[in-house]
């Protein structure tokens, strides 16, 4: 883990966060663990508190769920790099936020890889049923899977999650399944406005 971020507000600019699995923990943890003693670490037994995080011009690298947690977070003009550790499948995000939260919002970012095979990297999967990730006006490399997003292993409650996309370009941009919400221009603009207001205090 390169960074554990657990404060009411956080701002990172021009920072490189490099790792493999679980590079950036955008706290808080989910309310409940799935396995006994599954939460070990800071604030594992403390009440959960909402956090708003803002990342600008950052490079974040990893392979499995390398941006994860329950924060409301905005990533602006960042480079999101999947490391090629010769895994059959990789995942960028694993959100676990509240149903009424914002989740992770990526705007004008570059999703690149270290020569990962085409179609082997998912933009995200829900760590908890209400996880959310939105990808807006981003450039996606060929490593991004055509489906875009994935359920969490064999769980059947992923229909509560919200994965959204608008304005994607590049070899990894594709027609997604019905599970991924396609936002129109007005919806994407409103989501970005809300994210900036919450995470940048605009």
Which sequence ranges carry the predicted segments?
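Sequence-level preference for short, compositionally simple segments enriched
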Residues: 1-202
């Amino acid at each position: 883990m390169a960074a554990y971020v657990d404060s009411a507000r956080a701002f990172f600019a021009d920072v490189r966060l490099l790792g493999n699995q679980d590079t950036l923990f955008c706290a808080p943890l989910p309310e409940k663990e799935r396995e006994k003693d599954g939460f070990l670490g800071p604030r594992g037994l403390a009440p959960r508190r909402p956090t708003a995080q803002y990342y600008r011009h950052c490079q974040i690298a990893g392979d499995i769920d390398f941006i994860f947690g329950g924060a409301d977070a905005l990533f602006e003009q960042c480079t999101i790099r999947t490391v090629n550790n010769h895994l059959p499948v990789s995942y960028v995000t694993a959100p676990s936020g509240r149903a009424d939260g914002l989740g992770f919002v990526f705007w004008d970012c570059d999703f690149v890889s270290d020569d990962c095979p085409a179609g082997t990297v998912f933009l995200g999967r829900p760590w908890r049923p209400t996880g959310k990730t939105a990808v807006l006006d981003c450039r996606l490399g060929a490593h991004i899977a055509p489906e875009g997003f994935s359920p969490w292993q064999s769980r059947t409650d992923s229909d509560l999650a919200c994965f959204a996309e608008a304005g994607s370009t590049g070899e990894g941009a594709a027609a997604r399944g019905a599970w991924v919400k396609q936002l129109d221009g007005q919806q994407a603009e409103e989501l970005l406005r809300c994210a900036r207001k919450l995470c940048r205090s605009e």
